[in-house]
């Protein structure tokens, strides 16, 4: 069994940063598309189009999805844990609480991942340095979003609980998804199977609740945003997700939640000419310190230096 209580390699860190950029971009795509498309229909389009894209890529590479019943049961469970449940809870929760507060609750995903992994796995045990790093990263996310993110804390408790449950669902998905590598399923095939499973679960709900055939035809920029959300953030994103999960483990994978705010900040500076506030610099420093604690190499360097 792979030892996952090791520092991540440079390649794994690079893939994690790339994943944070892909998922950070999803907020832009969603912000454009949700103005014309209801949330449930948008989520269904996201996973359905991603499934079609991944199937085309798999076929062009001469690869096929596995046929074993246990693998397809796994795809359905991953679709439930990683898409259907958290997407629905987050959409509902964000309709009742500020998006900044929702982002802070969503950033608890790595905490739940490390606690659950400590209980149910043999090779992802909790250490003091890892716990300190996770708490520092969570504080960094809160600082980057700003003090306004914590307004409303303690009100709309059910909505806040929904976001926390979504974070727990993501953490459970990371643990459950480890088995696909053991079954010999390639990351791209696992990503394709998961979004197919999500599509099977979500399509009937979208048809019943939103009745999308009554919706007006979306504009071209909305269609482009949906394609970006499906192709870049979802198809490419989940392929990377399962690639990282196979070698770096659940806890390390969920660190992407801490990297998304800095990635979004970087994109804003480079492409939108946005400025960086003092609280964002503080948050960036806390996240960097937290990631260094979790990685462990910097702490070992100072120990040796002493």
For each of these PLM feature ranges, what is it?
Residues 1-44, 92, 152-179, 200-202, ...:
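Glycine-/small-residue-enriched transmembrane alpha-helix faces in small-molecule transporters
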Residues 8-13, 35-40, 44, 67-73, ...:
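Juxtamembrane helix-entry segments on the extracytoplasmic side of multipass membrane proteins
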Residues 22-30, 55-106, 143, 230-248:
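Specific transmembrane alpha-helical segments of multi-pass solute transporters/efflux pumps
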Residues 26, 49-53, 105-119, 135, ...:
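Alpha-helical transmembrane segments of compact multi-pass small-molecule transporters, enriched
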Residues 33, 42, 46, 93, ...:
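Hydrophobic/aromatic residues within transmembrane alpha-helices
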Residues 43-45, 83, 102-108, 176-199, ...:
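Helix-helix packing/entry segments at the starts of transmembrane helices
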Residues 54, 113-115, 119, 143-144, ...:
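Transmembrane alpha-helical segments that form core, pore/gating elements
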Residues 54, 76, 116, 128-148, ...:
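Hydrophobic transmembrane alpha-helices of multi-pass small-molecule transport proteins
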């Amino acid at each position: 069994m792979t030892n996952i209580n090791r520092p991540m390699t440079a390649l794994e860190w690079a893939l994690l940063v790339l994943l944070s950029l892909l998922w950070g971009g999803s907020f832009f795509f969603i912000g454009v598309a949700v103005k014309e498309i209801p949330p449930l229909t948008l989520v269904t389009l996201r996973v359905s189009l991603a499934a079609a894209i991944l199937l085309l890529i798999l076929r062009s590479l001469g690869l096929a999805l596995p046929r074993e019943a246990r693998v397809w049961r796994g795809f359905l469970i991953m679709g439930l844990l990683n898409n259907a449940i958290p997407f629905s809870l987050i959409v509902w929760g964000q309709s009742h609480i500020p998006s900044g507060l929702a982002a802070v609750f969503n950033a608890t995903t790595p905490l739940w991942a490390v606690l659950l992994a400590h209980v149910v796995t043999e090779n992802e045990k909790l250490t003091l340095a890892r716990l300190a790093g996770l708490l520092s990263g969570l504080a960094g996310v809160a600082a980057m979003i700003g003090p306004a993110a914590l307004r409303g804390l303690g009100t709309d408790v059910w909505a806040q609980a929904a976001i926390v449950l979504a974070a727990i669902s993501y953490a459970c998905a990371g643990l459950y998804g480890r088995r696909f590598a053991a079954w010999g399923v390639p990351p791209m095939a696992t990503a394709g199977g998961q979004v197919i499973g999500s599509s099977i679960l979500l399509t009937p709900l979208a048809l019943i609740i939103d009745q999308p055939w009554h919706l007006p035809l979306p504009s071209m920029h909305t269609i482009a945003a949906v394609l970006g959300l499906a192709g870049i953030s979802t198809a490419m994103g989940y392929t990377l997700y399962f690639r990282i999960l196979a070698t770096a483990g659940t806890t390390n994978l969920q660190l992407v939640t801490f990297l998304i705010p800095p990635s979004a900040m970087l994109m804003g500076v480079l492409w939108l000419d946005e400025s960086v506030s003092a609280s964002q610099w503080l948050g960036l420093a806390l996240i960097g310190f937290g990631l260094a604690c979790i990685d462990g190499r910097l702490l070992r360097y100072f120990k040796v230096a002493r």
